[in-house]
Design a protein with these regions (language model features):
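Signature of Gram-negative outer-membrane beta-barrel scaffolds
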Residues: 1-48, 52, 63, 179
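Residues that define the transmembrane beta-barrel architecture of outer-membrane proteins
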Residues: 33-37, 90-94, 144-148, 157-159
Length: 183
């Protein structure tokens, strides 16, 4: 449908006083094009019939964002597509896992670690107002992040008693740097 898009002064925070222009787009007109290859590589090496190592690498892009304001109770999420002011989120992930079967495959033990680097992650400014806000880019910050962790899993796959026991340690860190005190 029809849309309008604001442009803001370079090197300034996005707010009412830094609006340079408002561009109108007709239905079906392209506002901004983003793209990129999403590569996925994986490998498995079987050292013995009951021991293997698996590794994977991938990258991804997120062009559509869910904006959920967690500071107030509301069942409404706002959806925002990447545009002139909000870049798509990018992620790069690597993982490495070791898998071992015991007692003729009755038990399986696995240990897997991962690391993920993220760019242009969205977060809200303090006191952000998203409800019926046509210019949500004024309420959003974009930054970088990383996540890493390790997962342990022990499975008992057969017999009268079966199930699994697992433990995951993970950590996510984000940085939203701005040279402007209002952000």
């Amino acid at each position: 449908g029809k849309a309008t898009q604001r442009t803001y002064e370079d090197g300034m925070p996005k707010n009412e006083s830094t609006v340079q222009d408002t561009i109108s787009y007709s239905s079906g007109e392209n506002i901004k094009t983003y793209g990129g290859p999403e590569v996925r590589l994986s490998a498995r090496y079987l050292f013995t019939p009951d021991f293997s190592v698996k590794a994977s690498l991938n990258n991804s892009y997120q062009f559509l964002h869910t904006l959920s304001n967690n500071t107030t109770v509301s069942p409404i999420d706002t959806w925002k597509i990447s545009d002139l002011n909000i870049a798509p989120q990018k992620g790069y992930q690597a993982s490495l896992g070791f898998y071992k079967n015991f007692k003729e495959n009755e038990y399986e033990l696995s240990i897997e670690g991962y690391y993920k680097k993220m760019e242009d992650v969205l977060d809200f400014k303090t006191g952000a107002n998203l409800f019926l806000n046509e210019n949500v880019e004024t309420q959003i910050l974009q930054g970088d992040g990383k996540a890493y962790g390790v997962e342990f899993l022990l499975k008992k796959k057969s017999g009268d008693l079966n199930g699994w026991l697992s433990y995951t340690y993970s950590r996510s860190l984000y940085r939203f740097d701005s040279e402007f005190s209002e952000e």
